[in-house]
């Protein structure tokens, strides 16, 4: 009988099987808070590795960017086609305090706006707010039929497009440069700038679907904790001291 390896015999494995550790057991859950400019403050939860050694959990959270639907932040389905970017600037306890980082349209909404027989007009401008945030605003507009128009097409002439674009840049520059980032966010939510452009260009060519389709944050000023806490409806520690009334008792030394 040939001597060889019998595969049927069960043989003990070398070494001990390594115990698998659940990666989520090393993570902590933090709440993401939106600024007070939005109706719904609780954005959601985010996970981060627990602080260990030189790795701090707060450092891992700062700078994270979350993309949230404006419909969820405003509790209104009419804003479902707009997305807001929020950046974590500060961590307090288990809360991540965020600030506005940008705005964008969903792809399906942009595709649905582009149609035949009309002119598309786009404009963009780089502007600095009063609190030194450098932003780039992108606007989009479409021509529409005049009242009692029989002609099917609504194409604007090149001179009219240039005049409309000039107006769009002027209005965006004026509206954004005269306010802070929080005030600009208040204007962007109800689309105040879009309506202003539509009204101002009525004499050149009637427009429809005028939107600020994108807001890009190019440069932020030096981080100010007090400004961020005010934005979240919180305040820093009060500098003024409070008078403490205390009964003064003169210390009597016993004679030696």
UniProtKB/Swiss-Prot annotation:
Residues 1-18 have a biased composition (Basic residues). GO terms for biological process: translation. It is found in: Cytoplasm. Keywords: Acetylation, Cytoplasm, Ribonucleoprotein, Ribosomal protein. The modification N-acetylalanine is found at residue 2. Belongs to the eukaryotic ribosomal protein eS1 family. HAMAP family: Ribosomal_eS1_euk. Component of the small ribosomal subunit. Mature ribosomes consist of a small (40S) and a large (60S) subunit. The 40S subunit contains about 33 different proteins and 1 molecule of RNA (18S). The 60S subunit contains about 49 different proteins and 3 molecules of RNA (25S, 5.8S and 5S). This is Small ribosomal subunit protein eS1.
